[in-house]
């Protein structure tokens, strides 16, 4: 029976490591829900002043998304 216990513990150790790798590479939020503050500022600026005048807010939102794990 000791052989079965060792085998079971080895199998249970493999599963969490796979889950940890998956959660590290996958963003926790959907991109539409990440960084609501910078998204709001960016959108309001674009509506009022046009995209070319809002590069500061666009870049701030992109940096925020990248910090959340999104590749944009």
UniProtKB/Swiss-Prot annotation:
Q: What is this protein called?
A: Cytochrome c oxidase copper chaperone 2
Q: Which cysteines are joined by disulfide bonds?
A: 35-64, 45-54
What keywords sit in the KW lines?
Chaperone, Copper, Disulfide bond, Metal-binding, Mitochondrion
Question: What is known about what this protein does?
Answer: Copper chaperone for cytochrome c oxidase (COX). Binds 2 copper ions and delivers them to the Cu(A) site of COX.
Where is this protein found?
Mitochondrion intermembrane space
> Would the keyword Translocase be found if you checked this record's keyword annotation?
no
Example GO molecular function: copper chaperone activity
CHCH domain sequence ranges = 32-72
What Pfam families does the database record attribute to this sequence? Answer: COX17 (PF05051)
Q: Show the Gene3D superfamilies listed in the entry.
A: CytochromE C oxidase copper chaperone
Q: Which SUPFAM superfamilies match?
A: Cysteine alpha-hairpin motif
Write out the residues that bind Cu cation: 32-33
Family indicated by similarity: Belongs to the COX17 family.
Record carries keyword Thylakoid: no
Q: InterPro entries, per this entry? A: Cys_alpha_HP_mot_SF, Cyt_c_oxidase_Cu-chaperone
Per UniProt, the short sequence motif Cx9C motif 2 occupies residue numbers 54-64
**Sequence motif Cx9C motif 1, residues:** 35-45
One cellular component term (GO) for this entry is: mitochondrial intermembrane space
């Amino acid at each position: 029976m000791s052989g079965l216990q060792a085998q079971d513990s080895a199998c249970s150790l493999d599963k969490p490591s796979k889950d940890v790798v998956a959660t590290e590479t996958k963003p926790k939020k959907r991109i539409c829900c990440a960084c609501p503050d910078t998204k709001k500022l960016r959108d309001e600026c674009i509506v009022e002043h046009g995209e070319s005048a809002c590069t500061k807010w666009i870049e701030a939102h992109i940096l925020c998304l990248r910090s959340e794990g999104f590749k944009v």
